[in-house]
């Protein structure tokens, strides 16, 4: 689950991490009032959406007067911001975060992710702050310095000092960085994060380190332990279909193709999408119905797929391991009858009672096309989507 920048910074402040003073604005009146409360004569106005690249898209701007903040609010509040990380529709701007500015001496990068191979947390630091860290890793990997944290022992101050030396910090800056490093690691572990980024982490002209931006992604599997974080969820930033899928424990990701895919198992789902692409098709979604492909879940899965007007055919690829293929076939038939599908549905069943499942589908009298192999299923789906 993603958090907005202002939400992440509020949590940063709880962990004694240095952040600029800011005010959350939900309306034009809030923003006008905020500039009279904040210090200075220049403020940073930031659209709050769950996507990077806001600055390049015009969603972050320095404002110096009431007229400028009015113009910014009129431009963005209630509108959709399109960045390189969003789809063509962008994401809705409901909130603008207005904060005090500072004079910047240097921009750094500091982030943390989970390394699943070592089962540890990896911190990455770089002098290339303010840039996309993926680009830095690809073009100048020598600029990225790493520290590995064992969740059992937590971060140690000496690790922070080592990173500070590598970043060229000196004097009191090293002490500040070590504190920041240890507290970020503590936050990462205690809040069950999947990703944490401060980009940029700036060194001000006064020699103070400041978290100018903040990104937090919480492991959704751990939200049951953090009701206070669950309460921060912003449904307006999520795909409505993906939110509906989550209610039924369906893993759904919308794509831009025209062949709907319904599969049980994430690996098989990705393989199915690959083979559809291999044969010239374009998947409209990733959809994993999981091991318990019941009638109700299959029905909801069909509804999700058909809610996309671009879908011209549906490919169902089920491996009957945990559940029998004959039961899956009955579930598919019941779901098709309930939903009322008027586009081709290609079904490939394999595993326990697969032959019986295919026989049930063939005798259903419905517009279901049975396939014996995944290759055949993909080819049939591509032809059906093309109207052949």
Curated annotation (Swiss-Prot):
InterPro entries given in the database record: ATP-grasp_succ-CoA_synth-type, ATP_grasp_subdomain_1, Succ-CoA_synthase_bsu_CS, SUCC_ACL_C, Succ_CoA_ligase-like_bsu, Succinyl-CoA_synth-like
Gene Ontology CC terms: cytosol; succinate-CoA ligase complex
Binding annotation for ATP: 46, 53-55, 99, 102, 107
Record-level Gene Ontology MF annotations: ATP binding; magnesium ion binding; succinate-CoA ligase (ADP-forming) activity; succinate-CoA ligase (GDP-forming) activity
Cofactor note: Binds 1 Mg(2+) ion per subunit.
The protein's enzyme class: ligase
Protein name: Succinate--CoA ligase [ADP-forming] subunit beta
Native source organism of the sequence: Actinobacillus pleuropneumoniae serotype 3 (strain JL03)
